[in-house]
């Protein structure tokens, strides 16, 4: 009933564009990174069917990496691009575009945490686990130990707060805005992405600067800007998902607003967050800070602008014409590992 009421308002929905007062950038290795990412995803059996491969091709996750980390060295940028394609596919197949909870949900998510904690894959591995292990081992080699642990902690929280998101979708109505924001802050994957922003620019920030209250506020504002803008931009397809569909817009609608008013309320909050980020970033960079912290703040700006540009110029992930085919991944969920093993034998 909740979904049907929301779907009825989609045809007239107007989605706003967002702007920020700094230019976008993109690595000149973007197309090479994208091609290698597709090859890597294929080699790690993430592209479960030709239909799924075509979807990933038109989504352009390598371009997202190139826009958000334009100054990263080629080896690090490739690892980040491979991480992003893995993350989006795992998030879709484990949480978002399948049933709210399945027999495999706990096993899938705990396997991802175990890779971080134990640095090995289970036997037998779940879908995507070997790809995830490969990404983590590459990042361990490329990053300082502290930086990798920031990334790893963000990913542990992604896997564990996914359970809170599932619990919210098992309720007849959603939790409120405050509780949702807490869940969204960690299930989005933005914290691990932000933790790579310094290494991809001028090097790793020391803990005393990274955990400074103002710096953490900038990280949180970056998270909020990307997440809440995404809640608007992905609204049409998320409402058609079989499992997870509640977000900040639908919660405002649940509280009595029309869907259009809920979008505008959310957009106002995004723009306010952008203004707050700009003001605080200017204040922090006016202080005597390290080059690495300057690089981190630049990296947060790259992420905000890079994500917004990716949505407008590159990706078809949220395109209306693919909603019917892309919103429901139940036919792809829990791919048969024996079939993947046979595929590997054929390739060998």
Swiss-Prot record:
Entry keyword set: Lyase, Magnesium, Metal-binding
SUPFAM superfamilies xref list: Terpenoid synthases
E.C. number(s) listed in UniProt: 4.2.3.163, 4.2.3.171
Binding site for Mg(2+) 2: 96
Pfam families referenced in this protein's UniProt entry, alphabetically: Terpene_syn_C_2
Binding-site list for Mg(2+) 3: 230, 234, 238
Sequence positions that bind substrate: 184
Cofactor(s) required for function per UniProt: Mg(2+)
Site (Plays a critical role for substrate recognition): 92
Biological processes, Gene Ontology terms: isoprenoid biosynthetic process
Binding note for cofactor: Binds 3 Mg(2+) ions per subunit.
Site positions for Plays a critical role in the stabilization of intermediate cation: 88
Motif (DDXXXD motif): 91-96
Assigned protein family: Belongs to the terpene synthase family.
Domain notes: The Asp-Asp-Xaa-Xaa-Xaa-Asp (DDXXXD) motif is important for the catalytic activity, presumably through binding to Mg(2+).
PANTHER family: BETA-PINACENE SYNTHASE-RELATED, TERPENE SYNTHASE
Protein name: Sesquiterpene synthase MGU_11447
Organism: Metarhizium guizhouense (strain ARSEF 977)
Lineage: Eukaryota, Fungi, Dikarya, Ascomycota, Pezizomycotina
